[in-house]
Amino acid sequence: MKSNKKILFIGAPGSGKGTISKILVEKYKLVHISTGDLFRKKISEDSQFAAQIQNYLSSGSYVPDEITNKLVADFIKKIPKNQGYILDGYPRTLQQLEFMIKNGINLDCVFYLKIKNETIISRLSQRLFCQKCQKSYNLLLAKPKNGLKCDLDNTDLITRNDDRPEIITHRIEKFNNSVIPIVEFFKKSGIIYYLDAEQTLEETVIEIEKWL
């Protein structure tokens, strides 16, 4: 089954948008455009770029818009026009939204995953990542099959620096402050749907599929 829909997920860190995206990407042959994944890939390939933005990432701050905009736009240019995709983690600011509109990055539907702060902290404190392939796991929602090793390459799993409780709280505050005008814009466009991210991932996916 293939979809050509252009989809945006809006949700705080820990809302499940990355995991949900991967489920839909596999089922509907969509391209997953995660700013986090794009940055990690670029950092692993370009030491000069890594040095430039490492301070932002380690403190939980957003990278300057011009850097994020270029990274996302360069990636989208490589995607065929009839190919569906999921934007995950972009746009996060009004400046990024304006860049999207100006550069013709169009969307068919927007899903806003609403979740309580205490649930976010609980979920993120249980996140683990593979250092080699960047696959993510969650001890609450998506456990690795082999203890604390990656299912794909048996590499030891780690906790990211920005998943520490004090940084999580900072990330939640920044997200809440930046997301309101973006949500208001898409509300006026009539393409935004609100989802309860407190429910299971399976229940959330079933709701999303009603609009695909």
From Swiss-Prot:
ATP binds at G14, S15, G16, K17, G18, T19, R127, S136, Y137, Q199. Gene3D superfamilies: P-loop containing nucleotide triphosphate hydrolases (3.40.50.300). GO terms for molecular function: adenylate kinase activity; ATP binding; zinc ion binding. Signal peptide: none annotated. It holds the Pfam family ADK_lid. GO terms for cellular component: cytoplasm. It catalyses: AMP + ATP = 2 ADP. Belongs to the adenylate kinase family. This is Adenylate kinase. It comes from Mesomycoplasma hyopneumoniae (strain 7448). The lineage of its organism: Bacteria, Bacillati, Mycoplasmatota, Mycoplasmoidales, Metamycoplasmataceae. The gene is adk.
